[in-house]
Amino acid sequence: MGVDPFKTTETLEADKETNGGVPVKDKLTFKAPERKSRLGLDARAIEKKDNAKTEGEFKVPKKSAISVTSSLDEEDKSDVSGLDFGTENTRPVHSSRRYREKSSRSQSAQESTVTTENAGTSDISITPRTLSCTSSYERGGSNRHREEHRRDRSETPRSRQRNTYDEMDHYRRRESYRQSDRDYHGEKRRRYNSDWRTPGRSDWDDGQDEWERSPHGDRGSSYSRRPQPSPSPMLAAASPDARLASPWLDTPRSTMSSASPWDMGAPSPIPIRASGSSIRSSSSRYGGRSNQLAYSREGDLTNEGHSDEDRSQGAEEFKHEITETMRVEMEYQSDRAWYDTDEGNSLFDADSASFFLGDDASLQKKETELAKRLVRRDGSKMSLAQSKKYSQLNADNAQWEDRQLLRSGAVRGTEVQTEFDSEEERKAILLVHDTKPPFLDGRVVYTKQAEPVMPVKDPTSDMAIISRKGSGLVKEIREKQSANKSRQRFWELAGSNLGNILGIEKSAEQIDADTAVVGDDGEVDFKGEAKFAQHMKKGEAVSEFAMSKTMAEQRQYLPIFSVRDELLQVIRENQVIVVVGETGSGKTTQLTQYLHEDGYTINGIVGCTQPRRVAAMSVAKRVSEEMETELGDKIGYAIRFEDVTGPNTVIKYMTDGVLLRETLKDSDLDKYRVVVMDEAHERSLNTDVLFGILKKVVARRRDFKLIVTSATLNAQKFSNFFGSVPIFNIPGRTFPVNILYSKTPCEDYVEAAVKQAMTIHITSPPGDILIFMTGQDEIEAACFSLKERMEQLVSSSSREITNLLILPIYSQLPADLQAKIFQKPEDGARKCIVATNIAETSLTVDGIYYVIDTGYGKMKVFNPRMGMDALQVFPISRAASDQRAGRAGRTGPGTCYRLYTESAYLNEMLPSPVPEIQRTNLGNVVLLLKSLKIDNLLDFDFMDPPPQENILNSMYQLWVLGALNNVGGLTDLGWKMVEFPLDPPLAKMLLMGERLDCIDEVLTIVSMLSVPSVFFRPKERAEESDAAREKFFVPESDHLTLLNVYQQWKEHDYRGDWCNDHYLQVKGLRKAREVRSQLLDILKQLKIELRSCGPDWDIVRKAICSAYFHNSARLKGVGEYVNCRTGMPCHLHPSSALYGLGYTPDYVVYHELILTTKEYMQCATSVEPHWLAELGPMFFSVKDSDTSMLEHKKKQKEEKSGMEEEMEKLRRDQVESELRSKERERKKRAKQQQQISGPGLKKGTTFLRPKKLGL
């Protein structure tokens, strides 16, 4: 195919000015070959197919200054600030990546004047359409023929047909183009052969000054970027949504296809054209300006020309409204997710769906799309390593072409792109090694933590196998619900994208109603709104007994009332007492009131600890009603990030974690007169640590009393731990329970429980049913199946069927559902309550006659492979089984149906549950105990000591984070970390934010990580919610994505309707705002100033890396990573902002691993390898090119010997300190000895040795 030069050449006026004495004639402007993508492909080959021709010609006015006008592309409406135009030839300077910039300047203020040394007298108006400043290397035009040859080959027939329409317009200029071309090349040869160059100039910058004075208008320096996919193999089939690099909120989707920073050009030899320009003239990084990743309200207001249109288009896109049902579901799930979590952060429930992660169907769809992109034309699959080889081949071809151009004389030199390389970004070789602190004496290997004590008697038993396999009914119902939701979506058009296209909108009345319910005012008392106490309703009587008695009369009918005086007498006579009473006997609500009435609150307060949040709150509410006082006045409660107490509080209910943290500030707990450890039989992690601490408090304070309550018969163990203290038994008000076992093991315990409940409802006398399940998914599946089968039964049965009221019970029970549980059902309906193990002891429900025990429960177990605590299903213990059966005998003779065999009860169940301290991670516990000046943790008085390896490994984790020094003591960083109620890595991240001057941003990220996911993903709006979420993506980091979400919410005045428009959990965001406020108060107490890093979010990524460098992974394959230290494979999750970008970072750190179908990294952030070496020197080091491995080994040996010397010095100091203390004690005793004078004693002697005895 011939070369058609008429498409790109333009007629220019002659300029007879001189430059250095040499005439400067008019030059043609050629369009350079496009820059290569990160994978070495032509990143804009497809984009150029449909580019329209530039209209008009350049006009050369006669003036001396060059005016450079930066007009903004439609793609980016924000202002370009911070541009630095030098007066001399500039080189590409690396600037840090910036994500957000705000500016209030208008477009008219964006013009700047550049005066160039030795400039000609012409004034050239240049209007680049990219967001960049002008570089010295601009696009040249000397290779236009080659470029047009490429364009001709890549043009489609349609674009060629369109191009022919303009041929006549160019016909008149054709001869002038050819003449200009001949004149230009002739002059170029003459000038090149002449000796006009000065010694200060070289071939490298030859023509650069010429270029800056040449007419290279719109065609030479800019292009119109079209929303077309990149041709790289990673993005060949990607949708525009999948490639969002810097999403703009409220921006039409057609303008959101900007390239990812990861998809920019790789360092490769790029030709410098005859004019001295390089391809990357329009790069935004030269001037310090980079892609904005967040929608700026001020920036939008400045672009008045486009703002109205964009707002209208953005409004059209977000016309999908949240229905009332979806809003209720959103608030319900938000409450449930927040109050479900324990006091710890790193807890993953493998069976619970995560809002952030999405459902299985969408994840499989995304993974399938990614797999398709890596299939060759012949059908064979291509790994990422092979994809890189293919990309390198293209890069080599490009270099070959550049060499040919060099030989032909069309270009004068090559420039190696250094746009993404700075001095510190050179290729780093990361060496991995393990350094052990000397205080552990080599007794620990961080990556191979010993297996924790598993709470299962026989892993090969039937119950253990069934618990690992899970329920088939749950999966079946999940798929059925998903199918139903997708069917409904077709005719639920109002508010959907299709509805917007067809013009189907909600009525004004519906919109007003939704807005009234959601609320559009963000400036509310978020602290008060977030408190659970504001939502709890007054408890209503359910049983006939409760409805017929007043609250005072009900108190007198409780079993504990009959032994009130004897109990108080035992408390007066003993400092520690163990109280045993069945659940429902009144010990939790009445014991604290009895102590208050007996005068124990005159000189202090009565504290009562609970293992669960909901128990602490609901019990405090009940006691405040019985004492007829407001909650928060005399009666209060305190849980993590929520304190509802006041100066008049005399009875305080709290979680055991809250009391544990109070021991840090007041080791003797001086403000407490009595502490009641309620539900001690559950043996939570904090409870066991409190036992050891309170045992020392009892020894120091003789006026302090400790009461331990338990619902089971293992009270003798508590009594022995505190020194054989008395045990007081409260007589129970129980009725006989008939226990029925299953004849064969149940393969699907959820389906068996549903069938048993239906059988009871049809055949048994009146009485409510209680079903014990393991978790949220199973409870919802059981409720769905029960409802479905009841509808079938009512429709198919000829006789009247009693209604069945199905109610779930979660540990995070929302306030509205809590009222339903205790309300009496209407029309004589039977209640069927589906509950977790919270109903074993923490909640008492009247009217239960039938209990269905599945025999399973979820327990928190440390998973060393994942490196975190996870909720897993295990068979329950015999003690828990007896406790469940006892729930049927509270109001009358009951029946317990056990869905396992009697043999399994006797042989496959443990006698009592394994304490949590023996099966979980101990990082926080070790930090707390160290702060209490307990040096030797292995000698701490635990009731059930955890495995020694667990303690040592937790100490090693803290040493890695810098909380412990080389000799095992707390560092300054460690002392500060203790003050924050956070996991150690999050506390480290927060304090590193202070050191790096970005604590404002890190504080927001930590707050967002401390609450459940803020993304709401209704199944019937899955695609819309995914699209809305992608607008917030920051391609380098999921952590920065969370920061972006919070900042956008803040910019929109914390509005609730804005959250609904963008599928965000408004309650979750408000909870994050409350947590942020709590942490901010702690920072003020520590006198830490709140500083922000502004738009430079690279510093924030470094702070994140400082906390999670031990969870680092390097790239290996298609979206597959391996842990840098263990080699364990882990994958980017399809919901991650880093997923499917086309270029994935070489190194990432992640918050935690989630084990589902694969090991997925949750909350990943890209990091630089030298950050890992700088922040985690005990694991990583960078191999310098001028050092050998032998030198590295010598250096490691020196560091190790230095730590050993430090440890040896500490031991010597300890020995000397002990000798000095013994000497002081000896002298003190000598002074105290009395000098007694008597018969036979030498005067002044201190020894009673009579002389007459010859002694």
From Swiss-Prot:
Enzyme class: hydrolase
Motif (DEAH box): 678-681
GO cellular component: nucleus; spliceosomal complex
Motif (Nuclear localization signal): 144-153, 172-191
Record has Oxidoreductase as a keyword: no
Matching InterPro entries: DEAD-box_helicase_OB_fold (IPR011709), DEAD/DEAH_box_helicase_dom (IPR011545), HA2_WH (IPR048333), Helicase-assoc_dom (IPR007502), Helicase_ATP-bd (IPR014001), Helicase_C-like (IPR001650), P-loop_NTPase (IPR027417)
Knockout consequences: Narrow rosette leaves with altered venation pattern.
Composition bias type Basic and acidic residues, residue spans: 13-60, 144-219, 297-316, 1190-1224
EC number: 3.6.4.13
Keyword match Nucleotidyltransferase: no
Residues engaged in binding ATP: G581, E582, T583, G584, S585, G586, K587, T588
Domain Helicase C-terminal: 753-933
UniProt entry keywords in alphabetical sequence: ATP-binding, Helicase, Hydrolase, Immunity, Innate immunity, mRNA processing, mRNA splicing, Nucleotide-binding, Nucleus, RNA-mediated gene silencing, Spliceosome, Transcription, Transcription regulation
SS bonds (residue pairs): none
Gene3D superfamilies: 1.20.120.1080, P-loop containing nucleotide triphosphate hydrolases
Pfam families found in the cross-reference section: DEAD (PF00270), HA2_C (PF21010), HA2_N (PF04408), Helicase_C (PF00271), OB_NTP_bind (PF07717)
Domain Helicase ATP-binding residues, every copy: 568-731
The organism's place on the tree of life at top rank: Eukaryota
Compositional bias ranges of the Low complexity kind: 220-240, 271-290
Catalytic activity: ATP + H2O = ADP + phosphate + H(+)
Family membership: Belongs to the DEAD box helicase family. DEAH subfamily. PRP16 sub-subfamily.
Function statement: Involved in pre-mRNA splicing by mediating structural transitions of the spliceosome during the catalytic step. Facilitates expression of genes involved in auxin-mediated development including male-gametophyte transmission, apical-basal patterning of embryonic and gynoecium development, stamen development, phyllotactic flower positioning, and vascular development. Also involved in root-meristem maintenance and planar polarity of root-hair positioning. Acts as a component of RNA silencing that regulates distinct classes of endogenous small RNAs.
Protein name per Swiss-Prot or TrEMBL: Pre-mRNA-splicing factor ATP-dependent RNA helicase DEAH7
Lineage of producing organism: Eukaryota, Viridiplantae, Streptophyta, Embryophyta, Tracheophyta
Gene that encodes the chain: CUV
